[in-house]
């Protein structure tokens, strides 16, 4: 009886262990109801894991092997098992959609390259999107269709339901945190190039704008007037936060890129994203200038000049305060701009200013 009892317990232990291993290998660990998961392959997983962890809304990223021929593998056997180096991305759908997460992913992979990313060549370095929720397939297909319109050549990104997932060895987890100067084929700074969705903002009618805006705000944004220097709301504002289009609410500039140029108007080294502003030639005042307008609202913002700090790109966006609304860092989450908080906190401009002061 003791032997029988022992055998029962032994086999029960094996069964439980097998179930737990299968759960992990198939990527089906219990997720919280407010979490989602997607698996992304994009060459060496060291860089892709570190990159994904920098994206607002990503809860966790870890390295593993996906969609091979066998239920088990390791780093040394990938050429035999045909697994792809991949990153398991757990994210909060309230903070970032799958569509936007994929657009961040597309920024750091060559979508038409077959079995090669960066200097890494081989089947294990193929690109792929592997899903566990069948509803994600439609989102993935839509994102790839949009991407195909932007690139030359046929997209080579593999799209399949997740299978035979194996978590990578601990040595590979958080590799670039452990080895900051380690190999990485991805430019991690691309995570700071925030994506601003144009379908979230609309331009109000002229009637609405006249009611919503002050006389000065209306004249500046709609009739290209210029406010007085040194007598406007934001020219010397140093508080951390985001500057949005006064007419639409679309994010335009960040305190992280604001500096004192001495001109009397708010000055920025660049917009929060290159796509949120448009440019037109301006030959008024008998001189050539480049006018800056907002993307959605088409509001006049100011002008851009090439006399900015060379260390920050050499540009000076000279913008009217009346064209902007400032949202303090502490209020950004509740006002719907939480995804831009990491960008506001980055220290590129502060480091430049501190370096200038120390010399």
Curated annotation (Swiss-Prot):
Is the keyword DNA-binding assigned to this protein? Answer: no
Task: Provide the top EC class.
Answer: oxidoreductase
Q: Which UniProt keywords apply?
A: Multifunctional enzyme, Oxidoreductase
Which Enzyme Commission number(s) are on file for it?
1.8.4.11, 1.8.4.12
> Which organism does this record belong to?
Helicobacter pylori (strain ATCC 700392 / 26695)
Q: Residue limits of the MsrB domain?
A: 206-329
Record's superkingdom? Bacteria
- This protein is called Peptide methionine sulfoxide reductase MsrA/MsrB
InterPro entries listed in its UniProt record: Met_Sox_Rdtase_MsrA_dom (IPR002569), Met_Sox_Rdtase_MsrA_sf (IPR036509), Met_Sox_Rdtase_MsrB (IPR028427), Met_Sox_Rdtase_MsrB_dom (IPR002579), Mss4-like_sf (IPR011057)
Active site positions: 44, 318
Q: What's an example GO cellular component term for this entry?
A: cytoplasm
- Gene of origin? msrAB
In Pfam terms, one family for this protein is SelR
Q: Which HAMAP family match?
A: MsrA
């Amino acid at each position: 009886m003791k032997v029988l009892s022992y055998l029962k317990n032994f086999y029960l232990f094996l069964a439980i262990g097998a179930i737990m291993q299968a759960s992990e290998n198939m990527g089906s660990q219990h997720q919280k109801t407010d979490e989602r998961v997607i698996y992304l392959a994009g060459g060496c997983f060291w860089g892709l894991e570190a990159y994904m962890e920098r994206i607002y809304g990503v809860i966790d990223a870890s390295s593993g092997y996906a969609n091979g021929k066998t239920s088990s593998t390791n780093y040394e056997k990938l050429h035999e098992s045909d697994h792809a180096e991949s990153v398991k991305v757990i994210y909060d759908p309230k903070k970032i959609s799958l569509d936007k997460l994929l657009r961040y992913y597309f920024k750091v992979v060559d979508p038409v390259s077959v079995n090669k990313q960066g200097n890494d060549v081989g089947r294990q370095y193929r690109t792929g999107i592997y899903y566990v929720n069948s509803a994600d397939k439609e989102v993935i297909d839509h994102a790839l269709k949009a991407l195909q319109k932007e690139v030359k050549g046929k997209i080579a990104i593999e799209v399949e339901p997740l299978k035979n997932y194996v978590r990578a060895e601990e040595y590979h987890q958080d590799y670039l945190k452990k080895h900051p100067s380690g190999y990485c084929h991805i430019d991690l700074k691309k995570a700071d190039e925030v994506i601003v969705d144009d379908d979230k903002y609309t331009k109000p009618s002229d009637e609405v704008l006249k009611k919503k805006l002050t006389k000065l705000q209306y004249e500046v944004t709609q009739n290209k007037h210029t406010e007085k220097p040194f007598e406007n709301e934001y020219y010397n504002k140093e508080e951390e936060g985001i500057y949005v289009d006064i007419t639409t609410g679309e994010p335009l500039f960040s305190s992280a890129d604001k500096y004192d140029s001495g001109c009397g108007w708010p000055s920025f080294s660049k917009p929060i994203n290159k796509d949120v502003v448009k440019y037109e030639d301006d030959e008024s005042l008998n001189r050539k200038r480049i006018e800056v307008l907002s993307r959605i609202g088409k509001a006049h913002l100011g002008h851009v000049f090439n006399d900015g700090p060379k260390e920050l790109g050499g540009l000076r966006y000279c913008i009217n305060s009346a064209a902007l609304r400032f949202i303090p860092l502490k209020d950004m989450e509740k006002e719907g701009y939480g995804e831009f908080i990491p960008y506001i906190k980055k220290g590129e401009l502060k480091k430049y200013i501190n370096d200038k002061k120390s010399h």
